[in-house]
């Protein structure tokens, strides 16, 4: 977390940034703290450049060409396009705030965000998923891992949604889970039969032995009897992939991407996938159509070589 009082900026810019942080925190109460911190860090780096390179010591005196110079500097120093876009959003929000608070011109109004081609998500083939999920079941931890992987692949949950699941959030008789996604938005997601089978096995036969005397509503527990963390699950899936000799840099999110792509390839419509993934916009979901097209092209090229 940035401590504004310790920043190497002019006193005026420190005061402006302090007031801006208070304003941001007030209007973004429903957002996580890291969102505000990210905005503030972006603006600190921006003002630091403006002071060092342009010798302008008040944000109120910045001109449009100064913003352009800063963005050019970022581009020349090989910042990722996505990072530059985020910084532009931060800068435009900051100058909009300055314009409204100090009744000055919004000099960022003509600054456009560059178009960024979204990177296609990495996915696993159905064979790789089957291999990953084919776990040897010898103890409570194996059954927990099996239940988590089956649930994630059959429902497309985010990792945070998976590890946050509580006993009251699941209806195994009807095959549904209730989860809370971005913005604490609730959605109900159907769960596959295999996932239900291994969830029942884990919860009814093994979970109690993992509690270590703690009481918790969280379904998935670590070896200390507490809620498993996102990082904990990340390490588990890495270890399983290594044991299975899967030659890919597997992350938990790849299961979510694979779930969506395999659904689409098997005829599911985008709206259904959007609802299951919890995307607020179908534009986000449409990225999977590009993945499917790429797979189709690869298969076509493969068959061409066989002619």
Model-predicted segments: where are they?
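Conserved catalytic core of the tyrosine transesterase superfamily
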Residues: 1-307
């Amino acid at each position: 977390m940035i401590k504004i009082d310790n920043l190497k900026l002019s006193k005026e810019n420190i005061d402006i940034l302090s007031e801006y942080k208070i304003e941001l925190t007030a209007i973004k109460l429903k957002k996580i703290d890291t969102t505000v911190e990210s905005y503030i860090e972006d603006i600190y780096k921006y003002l630091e450049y403006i002071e060092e390179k342009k010798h302008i010591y008040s944000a109120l005196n910045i001109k449009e060409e100064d913003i352009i110079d800063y963005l050019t500097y970022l581009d020349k120093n090989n910042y990722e396009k996505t990072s530059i876009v985020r910084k532009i959003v931060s800068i435009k929000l900051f100058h909009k705030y300055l314009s409204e608070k100090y009744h000055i011109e919004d000099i960022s109004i003509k600054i456009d965000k560059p178009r960024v081609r979204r990177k296609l998500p990495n996915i696993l083939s159905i064979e790789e998923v089957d291999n990953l999920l084919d776990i040897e079941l010898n103890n409570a931890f194996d059954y927990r891992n099996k239940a988590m992987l089956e649930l994630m692949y059959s429902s497309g949950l985010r990792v945070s949604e998976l590890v946050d699941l509580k006993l009251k959030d699941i209806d195994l008789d009807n095959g549904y889970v209730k989860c809370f996604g971005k913005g604490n938005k609730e959605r109900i997601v159907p769960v596959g039969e295999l996932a239900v089978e291994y969830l029942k096995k884990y919860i009814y036969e093994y979970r109690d032995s993992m509690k270590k005397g703690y009481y918790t509503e969280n379904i998935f527990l670590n070896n200390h009897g507490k809620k498993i963390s996102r990082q904990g699950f990340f390490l588990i899936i890495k270890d399983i992939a290594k044991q299975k000799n899967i030659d890919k840099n597997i992350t938990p999110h790849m299961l979510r991407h694979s779930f969506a792509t395999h659904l689409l390839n098997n005829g599911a419509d985008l709206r259904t996938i959007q609802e299951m993934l919890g995307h607020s916009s179908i534009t986000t979901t449409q990225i999977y159509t590009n993945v499917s097209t790429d797979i189709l092209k690869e298969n076509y090229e493969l068959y061409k070589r066989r002619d």
